[in-house]
Amino acid sequence: MYKELILFRNELKNKSIPKYKIIGIVSELLLSKQVFLKNSDIEDFLKDIFGLEFKAYLFKSRTLLIARVTKEIISMEKDNEYKNKLYKFVQGKIDELKDNERKEKNQLDGWI
């Protein structure tokens, strides 16, 4: 997932990004069990990034959730604001994965 996050970050760096790319990035993130272990984790992400709140039944199915989020992204007006928030989120996940990788390497060094 680390390589995909790097690609997403590079796409989000562009000044103008088409909505279909934002939809693709968000869909990949929502479907990833490495980024969101539990469906309940997605709820905070959607509130922070897009300001979206859905009923509880939608969070039982990631595919239903993606359909609703896609619908909202298509109708949204503040593309740049959401793109910047999404960029910060992806960058945070990249940093988190780097830190986890370093910790694993440090633990293995003790055994050698």
Show where each model-derived region lies:
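Basic helix-extension-helix modules of the SAP/HeH family
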Residues: 1-112
